[in-house]
Amino acid sequence: MPAGLLGIEELGRAEIEAILSRAKDFQPLQSQSLKKLDTLRGKMIVNLFFEASTRTRTSFEIAAKRLGADAISITASGSSVSKGESLVDTLNTLGAMRPDAIVMRHSASGAPHFLARYLPTPIINAGDGTHEHPTQALLDARTILDRCGQLDGLKVAIIGDIAHSRVARSNVHLLSKFGAKIVLCGPASLLPVELAQLAPGVVLTTDIRDAIKDADVIMMLRVQLERQHEASFPASEYFRFYGLQLAHLDLAKPEAIVMHPGPINRGRELSSEVADFQRSVILNQVENGIAVRMAVLEKVIG
C-alpha cells in the first residue's frame, strides 16, 4: 500500500508531533506577501470529493498551490460516477493519469482504506462517512497547541452529534495519544455507549454542564441531519439542552477555548455571542487547516 494518510488511529504520537511541528513552520506564510514555495513544484494533486465541502476542499487546494504543486478538484457530479461508473473504475482512471496524490472525501466509511489497497497512488483521507477526518483532528490539535501550549493532560469536552461525527472519532484517537481526558456529550440518541471503548480516557455524559466543568477545550459539533434517517432529537429543543451559551463558559477553565469544525449553525449548536467571543478559535482552526494540510502533503509526496 502506498504511503498516504488514511486515519489518525494508525499514526504514532511521534508522527503526529512531526506533522504538527512542520505545520508550525508553515504558519508564518499566512502573513507574508509572497506565500508560494517550490517544495512540490511539478507535482499534481487531485481532490476528489463525493460530499459537499467548502473548508476542506479549498484548504487542500490552497495548501497544494502554496507548496508549488498543481491541484485539480473533481466533485461527484462532475465525475463519471454520476454516469454509472464504479468508484474503483473512476479511481483507477485517475490513477492511470499518474497524479502524485489523491485527496478523497466519501460518504462510505472505509472507502479510502479499501481503495488504497488497489491503487498505486497515495490517498489522503479528507473524511470518510462517520469514520475519520484525520486532517481536521490535526488542525484542531495545532490550534489547541497554539492557545494552550500543550495537549498532554487537558480536559477536552466534545459536544453534539457524536454518533455521526468523524471529527469526534479522529480527535478522540489523537487526543488519547497525549493523555487528554476526553468527555463526549450529547443526547443519548446521539451518544453510542461503545464510544467509551474507542480510546483510553473517554467518558460519556448527557449533561452539558458536567462536560464543560473545568474543561480546557470545548469542541462543539454540528448536528448532521443528512446522516440521520429520522430526527434523533427534536430540533426545537436541541439548543435549549445542548447549545453552548456564554453562561456555560463560567463552568470551564478561565482560559478555556471554544472550537467548531464548521459549518456552524448559530442558534443551534452555539449562540452568536459564543461564536464571536474572544475565546472562540473557530477562524484560527480554518487558518491552521492550510498549514496542517501543507505539512501532510509534504509528508506524503515530498
Swiss-Prot record:
Query: Gene Ontology cellular component?
Result: cytosol
Q: What does the UniProt keyword field contain?
A: Pyrimidine biosynthesis, Transferase
Protein EC: 2.1.3.2
Enumerate the Pfam families for this protein. Answer: OTCace, OTCace_N
Q: What class of enzyme is it?
A: transferase
Amino acids binding carbamoyl phosphate? 55-56, 105, 133, 136, 262-263
GO function term, MF aspect, one? aspartate carbamoyltransferase activity
List the InterPro entries hit by this protein, alphabetically.
Asp/Orn_carbamoyltranf_P-bd (IPR006132), Asp/Orn_carbamoylTrfase (IPR006130), Asp/Orn_carbamoylTrfase_sf (IPR036901), Asp_carbamoyltransf (IPR002082), Asp_carbamoyltransf_Asp/Orn-bd (IPR006131)
Pathway this chain belongs to: Pyrimidine metabolism; UMP biosynthesis via de novo pathway; (S)-dihydroorotate from bicarbonate: step 2/3
Reactions listed under catalytic activity: carbamoyl phosphate + L-aspartate = N-carbamoyl-L-aspartate + phosphate + H(+)
Listed binding positions for L-aspartate are: 83, 166, 222
Name the Gene Ontology biological process terms. Answer: 'de novo' pyrimidine nucleobase biosynthetic process; 'de novo' UMP biosynthetic process; amino acid metabolic process
Summary of the function given for this chain in its UniProt record:
Catalyzes the condensation of carbamoyl phosphate and aspartate to form carbamoyl aspartate and inorganic phosphate, the committed step in the de novo pyrimidine nucleotide biosynthesis pathway.
Family stated for the protein in its record? Belongs to the aspartate/ornithine carbamoyltransferase superfamily. ATCase family.
Question: What PANTHER family does the annotation carry?
Answer: ASPARTATE CARBAMOYLTRANSFERASE, ORNITHINE CARBAMOYLTRANSFERASE, MITOCHONDRIAL
Assembly and oligomerization: Heterododecamer (2C3:3R2) of six catalytic PyrB chains organized as two trimers (C3), and six regulatory PyrI chains organized as three dimers (R2).
HAMAP family associated with the record: Asp_carb_tr
Which protein are we looking at? Answer: Aspartate carbamoyltransferase catalytic subunit
Native source organism of the sequence: Solibacter usitatus (strain Ellin6076)
